[in-house]
Amino acid sequence: MKAFTKITAIVAPLDRSNVDTDAIIPKQFLKSIKRSGFGPNAFDEWRYLDHGEPGMDNSKRPLNPDFSLNQPRYQGAQILLTRKNFGCGSSREHAPWALDDYGFRAVIAPSFADIFFNNCYKNGLLPIVLTEERVDRLFKEVEANEGYQLSIDLAEQTLTTPSGETFTFDITEHRKHCLLNGLDEIGLTLQHADEIHAFEEKRRQSQPWLFNG
């Protein structure tokens, strides 16, 4: 998992509430358990004018010019700004995979669906909860200023605007530790590999019948 420390990046606005996981990555693309390759189909039904299916050459598909993420000014964005209850619907882990593969490192919203929120942390994506008032202000600033960037410092738990205004966000110490060090659940387990191996060797000696066959 990629570590998250600090970024300064373009913000892309998605001015919609209750964006569900089927909108983030439609069900027809959930045929792989690899974490990569989902970016070209993120927001597929909004992003393209035709109906997408696995195996299509996305570079030849007609883009929807009215979809905000297709606008040239938001290309290369690594921060997604959106509205309340983002990531609702099914619990598919492909949703944060698709956002990560698209290039997003952080998502800012007034609220997130619980399962999606937890899945973000497991996949190196930082979900930031801000008040609706602050999110409203950010939408206005992003839309009024082309190339608008925010700076996120995870260690300090701060978000800084181009004008220098800084505000904080909440995150548990455990989740912050994992993101700062690029540790998913497997990585956390492997930190204790020596202890696990010692335990197994001790058990092999005391209960050898468990290891026969």
UniProtKB/Swiss-Prot annotation:
Function: Catalyzes the isomerization between 2-isopropylmalate and 3-isopropylmalate, via the formation of 2-isopropylmaleate.
InterPro entries: 3-IsopropMal_deHydase_ssu, Aconitase/3IPM_dehydase_swvl, AconitaseA/IPMdHydase_ssu_swvl, IPMI_Swivel, LeuD
Gene: leuD
Name of the protein described by the UniProt record: 3-isopropylmalate dehydratase small subunit
EC number(s) per entry: 4.2.1.33
Signal peptide interval: none
Keyword set, alphabetical order: Amino-acid biosynthesis, Branched-chain amino acid biosynthesis, Leucine biosynthesis, Lyase
GO biological process, one term: L-leucine biosynthetic process
Record-linked Pfam families: Aconitase_C (PF00694)
Subunit structure: Heterodimer of LeuC and LeuD.
GO cellular component: 3-isopropylmalate dehydratase complex
